């Protein structure tokens, strides 16, 4: 069981690194030129590489769930012919061929599919070179660390797919949802603090600053008890007892009763969150994917911690 949990932690951190490694400013400039009746256009990816398209891509492979969700929101999900094993939303994504998992990308299969464009993470460096060597276009998006980064991602993807108007609508809808949440949380006299658990006992992990999840927590009007630390890290049970969180949120749907497992941990009975039974399981996909559901993620966090504001 311990070996299994160790592997689980490694896979979890890999998946989180895919959504939170380096901050960046988005390059979203686009140029067009006339080519007879059709216009070619150029979009710059996060490597600073210009990709020129003679026509709008008709077939797409995406190696990140957040990009898959964005493509569906843009109304071009029907063009996707390959996704990663982690793509679970929307339901239509479950029917698409899997060409990657946590650790590997099936580059040979992607080459066989011969998509017009491959959307990839900067962490797929080796596979990117392999795919590009065959002549495939690969558009690289670095990991988002902030809501602003996500807006930039959506804008870039929309430009590639010539769906800029819909991309702008998605961003405006997200901003509106976040503003609605923050209007409610602005009435709070005092913010609650939270311990955010991303790996179960005995090898407990949490998150701090410079992570996508930290930005969601702050936007939801909540304070992170480990905000002074950076990235993803292991914490001891003594650390958690000492910071005495008012709320505990876990994204670990591990076992039959994740909330009950936390409530019954030895030595935790003095923690305020345990005493007040404020321990909650939250959908890990929504709060770990920097895509079009970030407004929903922030609202979910706020509703979980401050349910009285949403009655």
Explain the meaning of each model-derived region.
Residues 64, 122-123, 143, 229-232, ...:
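Short secondary-structure boundary segments
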């Amino acid at each position: 069981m311990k070996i299994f949990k160790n592997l689980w932690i490694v896979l979890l951190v890999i998946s989180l690194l895919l959504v939170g490694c380096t901050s960046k400013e988005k390059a979203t400039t686009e140029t067009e030129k006339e080519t007879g009746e059709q216009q070619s256009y150029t979009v710059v990816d996060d490597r600073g590489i210009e990709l020129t398209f003679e026509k709008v891509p008709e077939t797409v492979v995406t190696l990140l769930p957040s990009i898959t969700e964005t493509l569906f929101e843009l109304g071009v999900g029907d063009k996707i012919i390959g996704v990663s094993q982690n793509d679970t939303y929307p339901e239509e994504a479950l029917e698409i061929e899997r060409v990657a998992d946590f650790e590997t990308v099936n580059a040979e299969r992607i080459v066989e599919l011969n998509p017009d464009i491959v959307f990839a993470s900067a962490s797929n460096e080796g596979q990117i070179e392999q795919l590009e060597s065959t002549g495939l276009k690969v558009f690289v998006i670095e990991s988002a660390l902030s809501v602003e980064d996500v807006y930039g991602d959506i804008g870039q993807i929309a430009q590639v797919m010539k769906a800029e108007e819909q991309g702008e609508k998605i961003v405006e809808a997200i901003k509106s949802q976040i503003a609605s949440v923050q209007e409610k949380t602005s009435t709070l006299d005092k913010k609650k603090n939270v311990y955010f658990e991303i790996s179960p006992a005995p090898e407990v992990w949490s998150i701090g600053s410079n992570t996508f999840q930290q930005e969601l927590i702050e936007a939801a009007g909540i304070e992170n008890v480990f905000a002074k630390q950076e990235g993803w890290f292991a914490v001891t049970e003594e650390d958690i007892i000492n910071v005495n969180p008012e709320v505990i949120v876990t994204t670990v749907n591990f076992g039959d009763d994740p909330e009950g497992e936390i409530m019954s941990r030895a030595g935790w009975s003095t923690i305020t969150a345990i005493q007040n039974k404020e321990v909650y399981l939250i959908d890990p996909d929504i709060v770990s994917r920097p895509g079009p559901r970030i407004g929903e993620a922030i609202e979910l966090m706020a509703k979980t911690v401050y349910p009285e504001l949403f009655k």
